[in-house]
């Protein structure tokens, strides 16, 4: 016999802490706008275990997309990202690696000639908001980088494998990230109308490759 009790809607959902975000203070004036590969390499030089952890990830550092007349340029090859004292660096790590990741505090990283000093980190649990946004989801090999419909079908398949019921999915603009082996093509994705468990699962497991590059 199989018997599943209904959920108690009055019981508050507790966000699990088996995977968390570590949000670091940083001291850095500027970075190359396209810093994905060099930043990832610098982090992994100190935290080599990241490649062994399926649920670990490195978030890219972002300034404002727009503001004061400045728009993030499409050609990032010679552009700089100017950072403020409020800028932060975020790593996604499993719980058993939190202490290991704290050893990054106090280090100075060289990101293509730009110095980044890593400060203290705070643990941040995942969001339960029904709308989640990913800036960069890698377009898999075999899909045309301009084929939005094929990419959407790929994303839906990946999400369903995670047990996520896709209700509203919006595909955004494409973006190429420089890599020594050739550009990595990505697209942004927004999911809406997620329930809390789906929102957390999506952040825990994610979709796409190159999570150590943002």
Tell what function each PLM region has.
Residues 1-214:
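RNA-interacting cores
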């Amino acid at each position: 016999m199989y018997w599943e009790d209904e959920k108690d809607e009055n019981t508050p959902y507790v966000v699990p802490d088996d995977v968390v975000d570590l949000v670091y203070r940083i001291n850095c004036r500027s970075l190359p706008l396209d810093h994905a590969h060099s930043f990832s390499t610098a982090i992994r030089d100190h935290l080599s275990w990241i490649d062994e952890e399926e649920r670990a990830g490195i978030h890219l550092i972002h300034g404002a997309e727009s503001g004061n007349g400045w728009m993030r340029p499409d050609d990032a090859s010679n552009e700089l990202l100017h950072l403020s004292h409020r800028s932060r660096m975020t790593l996604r790590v499993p719980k058993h690696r939190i202490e290991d990741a704290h050893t990054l505090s106090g280090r100075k990283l060289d990101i293509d000639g730009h110095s980044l000093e890593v400060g203290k980190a705070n643990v941040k649990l995942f969001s339960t908001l029904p709308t989640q946004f990913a800036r960069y989801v890698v377009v898999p090999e075999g899909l045309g980088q301009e084929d939005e419909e094929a990419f959407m079908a790929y994303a839906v398949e990946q999400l369903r494998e995670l047990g996520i019921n896709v209700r509203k999915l919006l595909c955004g603009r494409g973006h190429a990230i420089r890599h020594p082996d050739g550009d990595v093509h990505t697209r942004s994705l927004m999911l809406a109308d997620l329930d809390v468990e789906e929102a957390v699962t999506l952040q825990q497991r994610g979709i796409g490759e190159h999570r150590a590059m943002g």
